[in-house]
């Protein structure tokens, strides 16, 4: 790769977990293998990462957490986690990818073979995300198509899906009061539950396939496929539009939102600080998990995207800018959301706490209800769902791209040949689509909630981030990694980053992880429906299937490597000798011993493709 420096032969070679290119490829195959590729320019990388990390959670999760956890006071724990965990781990993953030029699995193999399970765990999480995250796009597409009508279908109770319990509450409200209707539902709720989902009584009854959602899901996958089928050459171009267009929509909705009556009261609810809430550990846990969710940490995406950078790209500045952009977007989205919720509160004459929602409830219930109260409701509905689609679309196709990158880097001989990449993406898309069909059945919402609550939960991300920072800072060596970064960008990053890797980030991650376990409450759909025991078993399987990769592959690699235990351990924490080294390598002054362990025997390695790809 551009700018890489050959390793000096000053000591025994480090363990090689990925076969050398000459060993992997026969001469006759080399002509058929495509180059790995790089971003054409820095902007493609920045927009691709921005598209991945700036998604639906910025709009429907962060504003609600601020309101729920003390308004402006929530920014105190949020920014503590931002500086101590968010930026350091975000930068670590991007720098790791840029340094190794590998996807998530092979990057960790090269750095520390013993902890290759970190990369495999991230692939598991990526796979789950690719199955269920795109379901939100299918819902949004359904709402978008439904908005092209003379009257929004969730405005009245005169539709074939409505029940006798449907009541338009606005037509029964006086000036500032609402008559209670305990056994009645709103038209927007019935549209969501009966028209879109057709929801059943529980996960035990999946019902039939919602064919309209299945077609919307198919359309979403077709779009994703053609966004990435040519690799970074196509992805880098597509993100110019998909990553910037949502900002135009956000600005339009912001201008509309703050000019609505009642918007000021909604914004006050959003920002009014309640410092007493900081005594609640739950507030701190919410801040920490939000950082990990919104920064796409421990999902393998950042490492894969960073791997397409040029070796001397200044990823440090890029990461800091992207982290601030992500948080700023969340902050601005809060003004959009709560100005509209304030408007709803005033129009309905109810406290804002009764209209505040998060997650799908905000996107598919609260906001659709709000647009029915506005002039030109179809226009605002279309703009909102177009914004949602683009926010989710680039997060989805970048996540698929990262899974493809990890797979190709694991099997370069088989998958880098002409036409193989397109076939691999098609295979992933078809498999995820077929699995996703279970999530667009009448009982699919219950499965979706299991994926969302367990598969990529804060517990999983905190667990993996703890191992990531421990592996880099204490096993590979924070100083050594700083040397590598200095070789790439020309200077050493702010010392707080290294201090965070060594002490602050592991401590906060461990504390938050343990607290999350202690405060665990089983999932309830709508806070009402209790899953059967086998449903929770599926949920915990989704959660543990990623976390177990780390200890499992530590044991497997130790057992499959030959030799005395201490020798095996030393071999498996030795980085790959093919990794680029700083120009002023320590071996030049006779101090190579701290960087390289003893030479591993070829027979003792388990890095070959046949032995490690289980």
Swiss-Prot record:
Gene Ontology biological process terms from the UniProt entry: amino acid transport; gamma-aminobutyric acid reuptake; gamma-aminobutyric acid transport; glycine betaine transport; monocarboxylic acid transport; sodium ion transmembrane transport
Chemical reaction(s) catalysed: 4-aminobutanoate(out) + chloride(out) + 3 Na(+)(out) = 4-aminobutanoate(in) + chloride(in) + 3 Na(+)(in); glycine betaine(out) + 2 chloride(out) + 3 Na(+)(out) = glycine betaine(in) + 2 chloride(in) + 3 Na(+)(in)
Subunit: Interacts with LIN7C.
Record-stated family: Belongs to the sodium:neurotransmitter symporter (SNF) (TC 2.A.22) family. SLC6A12 subfamily.
PROSITE patterns xref list: NA_NEUROTRAN_SYMP_1 (PS00610), NA_NEUROTRAN_SYMP_2 (PS00754), NA_NEUROTRAN_SYMP_3 (PS50267)
Main subcellular location: membrane
Keywords linked to the UniProt accession: Cell membrane, Disulfide bond, Glycoprotein, Membrane, Neurotransmitter transport, Symport, Transmembrane, Transmembrane helix, Transport
Biological role: Transporter that mediates cellular uptake of betaine and GABA in a sodium- and chloride-dependent process. May have a role in regulation of GABAergic transmission in the brain through the reuptake of GABA into presynaptic terminals, as well as in osmotic regulation. Probably also involved in renal and hepatic osmotic regulation.
Name the UniProt record assigns to this protein: Sodium- and chloride-dependent betaine transporter
Pfam families: SNF
Cellular component GO terms held in the UniProt record: basolateral plasma membrane; cell projection; membrane; plasma membrane; presynapse
Tissues with expression: Expressed in kidney, liver, heart, skeletal muscle, placenta, and a widespread distribution in the brain.
